[in-house]
Amino acid sequence: MKVYIETMGCAMNSRDSEHLLSELSKLDYKETSDPKMADLILINTCSVREKPERKLFSEIGQFAKIKKPNAKIGVCGCTASHMGADILKKAPSVSFVLGARNVSKISQVIHKEKAVEVAIDYDESAYAFEFFEKKAQIRSLLNISIGCDKKCAYCIVPHTRGKEISIPMDLILKEAEKLANNGTKELMLLGQNVNNYGVRFSSEHAKVDFSDLLDKLSEIPGIERIRFTSPHPLHMNDGFLERFAKNPKVCKSIHMPLQSGSSAVLKMMRRGYSKEWFLNRVERLKALVPEVGISTDIIVGFPNESDKDFEDTMEVLEKVRFDTLYSFIYSPRPFTEAGAWKERVPLEVSSSRLERLQNRHKEILEEKAKLEVGKTHVVLVENRREMDNQIVGFEGRSDTGKFIEVTCKEKRNPGELVKVEIISHSKGRLIAAIKGN
């Protein structure tokens, strides 16, 4: 039996797809990259924006046309959580719907017709923190919490993922040790509000926080690097930033989701901080780690966003000079406060703002890339680069999150840490040679 999984959205969805595959492997399913050959097609969905939801029904239609006659289609993930049985009504070719917090039930629903499992409000004490068998890999995703208690006006995640629960630290450490023994060199810690770790456990456990967890994980032999996503700026206090800076195994790259550079818009968004507060956190971080790589999320066209509000966002872009930018036009979502508001920024205005934001960020990346030439980085080898069956180099990321293409004829294995020097750049890409060659 073969299964094809289409994964949309965030790293948490990628982790859930790994979990789905692990559960199905117990039933002798093997993964295939060709949906035409699959006995089971799963679409693991994202509902953060409207566009992926529209794409879902297009994907269902395409898969229904090409699938084997008896193959089943299942919809999983966040869109499944909030649409539930409505998906079955809109897409009769779908056999079952499985919500984001019901992944472990996949074996119970694949043999049913028109099954719906989308509950998110079950007993916390009974919640199984399902660590599962994974393929050996250099970089592994590791869940440390699930759900979110924030009430951002635009965000559907608390509705689809449920309330925030931290996984007990002893379970996380056991899983990390297992991954390290299986060859993992870099951990990516996952949570909707990852740096709020410790806020609530499923049962009584000693009080710990995110920095405590990072320190413990860094002691595990074999783990060379630790990254995490997605944190909330509100929890980036001085204590956290200082311990982040001091821990040598915690990568010096961090996601700081701004969302808007306007204090007025941030207040409407219910983000809990101001433009000035955000810039203060960045200033403190850069004082501790001058070379830190910072990524961010920005929404343009939020209801009532004025020209001045957008200029405030552009001002923050100029001051921080983010290394990575994920930017989108505001998308109204069901079950959110802002989704019920009637005020809308015209699409042509939002589109113009997005284009301007993205174009300026591309220029910033070019400016920053020029300054990288001559600098050295330690790269974790992820993939070899080959041409005509000859090794021409490898690819990987620096400690600060920079993606680097390295030119060399030497064989370097995935998982190695290699010191390189940036020799050139092209359209924001960094090209390097092994240091000393």
Curated annotation (Swiss-Prot):
Q: Could you tell me where this protein is found in the cell? A: Cytoplasm
Q: Which residues bind [4Fe-4S] cluster 1?
A: 10, 46, 78
- As recorded in UniProt, its EC number(s) are 2.8.4.3
Primary subcellular site in the record, as a coarse category: cytoplasm
> Which SUPFAM superfamilies does the protein's record reference?
Radical SAM enzymes
Q: Which reaction does it catalyse?
A: N(6)-dimethylallyladenosine(37) in tRNA + (sulfur carrier)-SH + AH2 + 2 S-adenosyl-L-methionine = 2-methylsulfanyl-N(6)-dimethylallyladenosine(37) in tRNA + (sulfur carrier)-H + 5'-deoxyadenosine + L-methionine + A + S-adenosyl-L-homocysteine + 2 H(+)
* Residues annotated as signal peptide: none
Matching entries from NCBIfam families are given as: miaB-methiolase (TIGR01574), MiaB/RimO family radical SAM methylthiotransferase (TIGR00089)
Q: What is this protein called?
A: tRNA-2-methylthio-N(6)-dimethylallyladenosine synthase
Please tell me the species this chain comes from. Helicobacter pylori (strain P12)
